A protein has these predicted regions:
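Short Gly/Pro-enriched loop/turn and capping motifs at secondary-structure junctions
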Residues: 172
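C-terminal functional modules
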Residues: 154, 159, 175-210
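Short Pro-Gly-centered flexible turn/kink motifs
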Residues: 159-165
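Tryptophan-paired
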Residues: 4-159, 209
Length: 210
């Protein structure tokens, strides 16, 4: 997410938004001020809590990118769209069904990302010479150490605290477009986090991108 002004934020809903900012070098941090943001436990979902949206770029391996003839392509970057299924990329949706043994019944090239995701297929569109993937991390205040149960004050921003987020690993590709749908914060985690909560002290959070 990006700061729109001092009082509220808005999602970076486009891959080509000009206000994506670069990450700090390893061992260094970038800082951003955000307002206090606390809520009751039932309201701890992705439209209310404060989070960070990360954009990554990648180039698929040619040997793992399958064309319409069932063979690996020479250069994945000549294609504007790729489909990802079961750890391989495909140049068309038809190739996903034919060579990836995916169930593509009812799907077309015009199907939405949500319709594709329902069958474990992810669409990636090239921009800026590479393909992009996105990750959301929702900032925790009090971790209950249970990834499936929402805790009281688990997600939120409380005044007089510094929240430090450190990305420690990336486990899997995220979606091909920014994920802005309403979800509970306690959902499948894209980031594994270790952090401490102390007043007026940096709250360290190590994050694994999944």
């Amino acid at each position: 997410m990006c700061i729109r002004d001092r009082f509220y934020t808005n999602h970076l809903s486009k891959q080509t938004d000009s206000n994506w900012s670069g990450l700090a070098d390893a061992g260094k941090y970038v800082s951003m001020y955000c307002l206090e943001n606390c809520m009751f436990r039932p309201a701890q979902n992705t439209v209310y809590t404060t989070g960070i949206m990360l954009k990554g770029t990648f180039t698929p391996e040619a040997s793992q990118t399958i064309g319409n003839n069932g063979n690996p392509v020479e250069d994945p970057l000549v294609f504007n769209t790729l489909y990802y299924f079961n750890y391989k990329f495909y140049t068309t949706l038809a190739a996903v069904g034919k060579y990836g043994d995916a169930n593509i019944d009812g799907l077309t090239e015009e199907s939405s990302d949500a319709e594709l995701a329902a069958k474990q297929i992810t669409r990636f569109t090239k921009n800026g010479g590479n393909f992009s993937t996105f990750y959301n991390y929702w900032i925790k205040h009090l971790d209950n150490n249970n990834p499936t149960v929402m805790g009281v004050m688990e997600f939120g921003i409380v005044r007089n605290n510094i929240y430090s987020v450190n990305i420690t690993s990336i486990k899997n590709l995220g979606p091909g477009t920014p994920d802005t749908k309403l979800d509970p914060d306690e959902n499948k985690a894209f980031l594994d986090v270790e952090f401490g909560v102390y007043p007026w002290i940096v709250r360290d959070q190590d994050a694994d991108l999944e």
